[in-house]
């Protein structure tokens, strides 16, 4: 994967207060990508409000990070027999946050910014038609308490309804993630937060940020491969994920977790 992408052009990915994450070529400044995270969509009309100058709004305010990930990671133990037949699926993923513009994070596949077509099984080209393949995960939402939540009760498939309810509960521990990515001391182009864990799976490890609904500090382990599930570790007191933060709130309420350093 590294050899195949050795000549890949350099890219700059920056959040903008126009509501988008932009991707520009480092050599010419040519825009290759513009993505509007789901969490900022409801307040985009504020950009043209006559009174905007009197009430500044934040949109895509977080600092993105990138890393190379095997999307098939964890599917087979390297020590198991037959591992020589294992076929990895390497991609370069970008993890972005909204910072003060909203809560949560999103994940994009930015493997090949020069591709115009994408054969089956390869990295998607940067086109609107490939949006569903480029966006691996979008777990962003606005910062207001009045923002509508998914109507899980209207779902008729039991599994989908359960997943919807679980996602709502998980989101209560995700706040404004404002911390800058933690960089590798030996390679400033690499974030240590996107990493392979000891279970052979790939994940991004983040603090949950501030002003979450549950108001407690939580370590987020968002898997980037396979089913992309979210694991949470409450970082203080005797709490577990299932503990009601309003009951056992020792050193918890009005709190949050910044960016962790993975060792």
Question: Which positions does each model-derived feature cover?
Answer:
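A fold-level detector for beta-propeller and closely related beta-sheet-rich head/sensor domains
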Residues: 1-263
């Amino acid at each position: 994967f590294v050899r195949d992408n050795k000549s890949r052009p350099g890219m700059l990915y920056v959040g903008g207060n126009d509501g988008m994450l932009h991707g520009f070529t480092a050599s010419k400044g040519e825009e290759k990508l513009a993505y509007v995270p789901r969490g900022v969509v409801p307040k985009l009309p504020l950009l043209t409000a006559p009174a905007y100058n009197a009430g500044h709004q934040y949109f895509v305010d977080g600092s993105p990070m990138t890393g190379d990930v095997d999307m098939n990671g964890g599917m087979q133990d390297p020590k198991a027999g037959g591992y020589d037949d294992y076929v990895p699926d390497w991609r370069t993923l970008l993890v972005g946050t909204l910072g003060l513009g909203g809560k949560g994070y999103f994940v994009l596949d930015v493997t090949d910014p020069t591709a115009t077509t994408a054969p089956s099984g390869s990295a998607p080209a940067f086109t609107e038609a490939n949006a569903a393949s480029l966006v691996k995960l979008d777990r962003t939402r606005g910062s207001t308490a009045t923002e509508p939540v998914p109507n899980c009760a209207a779902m008729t498939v039991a599994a989908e309804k359960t997943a919807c309810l679980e996602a709502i509960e998980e989101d209560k521990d995700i706040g404004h993630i404002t911390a800058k990515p933690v960089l590798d001391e030996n390679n400033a182009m690499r974030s240590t937060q996107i990493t392979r864990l000891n279970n052979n799976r790939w994940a991004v490890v983040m603090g949950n940020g501030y002003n979450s609904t549950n108001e407690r500090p939580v370590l987020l382990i968002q898997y980037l491969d396979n089913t992309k599930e979210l694991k949470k570790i409450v970082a203080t007191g005797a709490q577990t994920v299932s503990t009601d933060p309003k009951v056992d709130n020792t050193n918890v309420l009005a709190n949050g977790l910044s960016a962790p350093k993975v060792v």
